[in-house]
Amino acid sequence: MPDLSAEAIDRMTPGELVTLVENLDPQDAALPDVDIDAVARLIDPAELQDDEFVRLIAGMQRLAGASVDVTKMGPQTFARMIDRASKDQLEQVLVHPELRDLILGEIFRRMQAHLRVEKAAKVDAVVHWRFSGGTGDEGFDRYETIISGGTCTVNRAMTNDARVTITMPPQDFLRLITTNASAPVLFMTGKLKIRGDLAFAAGMLGLFDLPTP
């Protein structure tokens, strides 16, 4: 078992940290003590080769079903990772269905926690999200968010008629929800497509506390 103390982790280079995450044994009894947020804070994607970034996310995906709680990565840490990752790095990760599911699933899982309850208290809306390059119907990965009574529920099945349907590449979605991209710019360049209530869609992100790098 490698030395997982804070002091040892602080001495590692980003590449060594990637190798550490990649080689951790999911069955090791010491894994619950690993501070995954501290590890991620020390890794700058800009200092990694594209394959190293893929290996990092793959390592986290492998640990997600073990005793390391990858959901404990803080929102600011996650936003910084997306901010520092290159377009090629994000695209290479998102072509892997299991890694794509990990990242998108974690974002939607956190939506309830980041909902501004006071702003959403009187909102009643169903939003359908379609991400291109997926494995679902017509080549899209789909998520449904239901905002009602100050809560946000997420489904993979489309259970209700949508007030608005949003279609976009997943890498642009990652940049959008970590405030690394502008919705108007994405819309004007055709990367963000909206069907339905445009006025609601324009203000929808304001219902959430978006993390900043």
Annotate each PLM feature:
Residues 1-213:
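Feature captures hydrophobic
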